[in-house]
Swiss-Prot record:
Residues 1-10 have a biased composition (Basic and acidic residues). It holds the Pfam family CsbD. This is UPF0337 protein M6_Spy1542. InterPro entries: CsbD (IPR008462), YjbJ_sf (IPR036629).
Length: 66
């Protein structure tokens, strides 16, 4: 797992905790902030997945061209 993906997972967990705490306490602002943090982190994770896939495809093409 890449460092970027690990950071994204930690941010997702943090966002989920904030969202849950907001729901539990009725704090809609905290709930919304947690949801946004979690969603952005998921986007970062997906971007890292795409980056890794492209890098893998480039490496495969390079191998075939040798």
């Amino acid at each position: 797992m890449s460092e970027e993906k690990l950071k994204a997972k930690v941010e997702q967990a943090s966002g989920s905790l904030k969202e849950g705490a907001g729901k539990l306490t009725g704090d809609k602002e905290l709930e919304a902030k947690g949801f946004v943090e979690k969603t952005i982190a998921k986007g970062k994770e997906l971007a890292d997945d795409a980056k890794e896939a492209v890098e893998g495809a480039v490496d495969a093409v390079k191998e075939k061209l040798k």
